[in-house]
Amino acid sequence: MKKCICCELGYVDDGGDGICTVCGWQDDDIQNDDPDFAGGANELSLNEYRRKFKEKRKINSNYVWAESKT
């Protein structure tokens, strides 16, 4: 397991394509290396996803992606 590059709160499996249960970011080496690249495993770029996650946490400081999917 490694710390999520997007939210730095959750963890993803080593070896690629794990999904963080805190923010929902799917680990993608290309997007991790180029944070402005949209596409690949995630529709949004890493920078866009970080911004949206931070906005959600401002509205609800306890927001967790995994809970929003149920």
Question: What are these model-derived regions, one by one?
Answer:
Residues C4-C7, C20-C23:
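Short cysteine-rich clusters marking metal-coordination/redox-active sites
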Residues W25-Q31:
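Short Cys/His-rich micro-motifs in 6-15 aa windows
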Residues K2-I5, Q31-P35:
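Generic, low-specificity signal for short hydrophobic/alpha-helical stretches with a mild N-terminal bias
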Residues C23-W25, G39:
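Short, low-complexity, polar/charged sequence segments that are solvent-exposed and flexible
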